[in-house]
Amino acid sequence: MGQQVLKSSNEKMEKAVAAYSRELATVRAGRANASVLDKVQVDYYGAPTPVVQLANITVPEARLLVIQPYDKTSIGDIEKAILKADLGLNPSNDGTVIRIAFPALTEERRRDLVKVVKKYAEEAKVAVRNVRRDGNDDLKKLEKAGEITEDDLRGYTEDIQKETDKYIAKVDEIAKNKEKEIMEV
């Protein structure tokens, strides 16, 4: 029973770190990256639709993103949605494609992005710690029910703590790499 709690906690911590990595992909670091548009929803025939479902997105150059809509009539809606998403991007529409040039980041903007990265990192650490707390609670319930001994409880609790430390270190490492990428000029 205790092993199942450990395995479950480990999987949940892994998912929390993976979610954090996906979240960081949306933080732009001066280079064009299609994932910055992942959360942009276009009002397409009355239904909110992700840009990635409406257009082909390519990165022909390091600082340029090209969006080629499958339906040319939706180009204006896509452009409006990008502006409305407030990503700090200025799309230019030539009638067939939308081009987004990524300007070089200012020092101030870089610092703001580092703060965002740190905020996301803290949220990821809290998620990992919540998994640890839930796992420890489950283990205590098992011990109360007599399914594991007090010694087992202590051992499993230490194992969960080791996993927690490992995943928090992973979050710190990912954050450090992203900060380095952002501060690169």
Curated annotation (Swiss-Prot):
It is found in: Cytoplasm. Pfam families: RRF. This is Ribosome-recycling factor. GO terms for biological process: translation; translational termination. The keyword Protein biosynthesis applies. GO terms for cellular component: cytoplasm. One of its GO terms (molecular function) is ribosomal large subunit binding. Belongs to the RRF family. Keywords: Cytoplasm, Protein biosynthesis. InterPro entries: Ribosome_recyc_fac (IPR002661), Ribosome_recyc_fac_dom (IPR023584), RRF_sf (IPR036191). It comes from Bacillus cereus (strain ATCC 14579 / DSM 31 / CCUG 7414 / JCM 2152 / NBRC 15305 / NCIMB 9373 / NCTC 2599 / NRRL B-3711). The gene is frr. Responsible for the release of ribosomes from messenger RNA at the termination of protein biosynthesis. May increase the efficiency of translation by recycling ribosomes from one round of translation to another.
